[in-house]
């Protein structure tokens, strides 16, 4: 069961919204190579506000993700892409329902 998560809020610098969206799609490709990250949603919350929600089976998987290539890339590109440092919140999943694959936006 997926029991732990991460909610990462990102605020793009003015004019960098498309770059942040592209970065998130590249991150999705990297996450597909992480066996300890079974669920990831890249989200747009508003014109310049984005988020990522990841879910994990255990703390080891979550920590592996936090120590992995996506997090390192985010911290490397954050000064150029983001208006403020990313907000990273550890979450506990109380319940879930995922019945089909979600398609990515065009």
Predicted features and spans:
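Glycine-rich beta-strand-turn "strand-cap" elements at beta-sheet edges
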Residues: 1-4, 38-49, 74-106
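Short, well-ordered beta-strand segments in beta-rich or mixed alpha/beta enzyme
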Residues: 5-10, 39-69, 104-105
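Short, surface-exposed ligand-recognition loops at beta-strand->loop->(often short) alpha-helix junctions
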Residues: 9-21
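Non-catalytic surface loops within mature trypsin-like serine protease
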Residues: 12-14, 58, 92-95
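Intrinsically disordered, low-complexity acidic/polar segments
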Residues: 17-19, 61, 97
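An amphipathic, aromatic/His-enriched active-site/gating alpha helix that lines ligand/cofactor pockets
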Residues: 26-39, 55-90
């Amino acid at each position: 069961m997926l029991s732990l998560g991460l909610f990462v809020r990102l605020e793009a610098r003015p004019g960098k919204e498309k770059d942040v969206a592209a970065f998130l799609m590249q991150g999705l490709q990297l996450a597909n190579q992480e066996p300890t990250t079974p669920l990831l949603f890249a989200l747009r919350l508003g014109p310049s506000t984005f988020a990522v929600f990841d879910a994990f089976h255990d703390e080891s998987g979550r920590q592996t993700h936090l120590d992995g290539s996506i997090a390192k890339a985010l911290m490397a590109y954050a000064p150029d892409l983001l208006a403020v440092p990313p907000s990273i919140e550890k979450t506990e999943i109380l319940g879930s329902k995922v019945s089909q694959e979600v398609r990515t936006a065009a």
